[in-house]
Amino acid sequence: MIRTFFAALLIALPSAALAQAKSCIVPDALPELRAEAPPPGQIRKVPVTGYLLSLSWSPQYCRDKQGNPADASQCGKDARFGFILHGLWPEGDRQIDPAWCGEAKPLDAGLVKQHFCMTPSARLLQHEWAKHGTCMADKPDRYFRAASILYRAVRFPDMNALSRRGVTTGVFAAEFARINRGMTPAMVRIMTTPGNWLKEVRICMDTAFKPRPCPKGEPTAPPKRRLNIWRDER
């Protein structure tokens, strides 16, 4: 059933331009990728009851990493991103989520480069396929194509304006939902740092990849708390 919906997604949703990669240079050379073994006791082959699309606010991630060679492709002087895709994650009942469902060989370099401006880290792409993608698809290209379609379908608010305006988590969630048709604030989860800086936005989806109210227990920042948004002003 899940793979039937998965195949339908690939057919039904068109491709679109990447709006969040303000400046992305795909590296000629990639780090060597290795098969990632699941941590002990973490293999969970359980039924999929929904999905999370996790979007990372890159300016916050890069705030103290601009001199780190390991993050140069995302945070270096020639790289500028808004929201990047952290991952597409299958979910199970009672927060027991599918994970590490099969063997994940090192990704092909061409596939990594194809999706690099969506997720500008070869190692993160490898990890997402190993931990989450193997529970959704039989091949990595199908998993990342679905993730790319969903990512490209998301509309993003004016982050500079929201940052300067000063908003609560609840107001931000409402604005994010307002510009995405069919979405309500209850379908969005906001993740923050200990200092209440925006870290991630997570969109809850059903098994047909449509936004749904997030299940009880999904973590999110309190709606009345002030939300700080770091801006990349380079």
What are these language model-derived features?
Residues A37-S121:
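Betabetaalpha-Me/HNH-type nuclease active-site subdomain
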Residues Q20-S23, P27-R34, G110, S121-R234:
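C-terminal, well-folded lobe of enzymatic/effector domains
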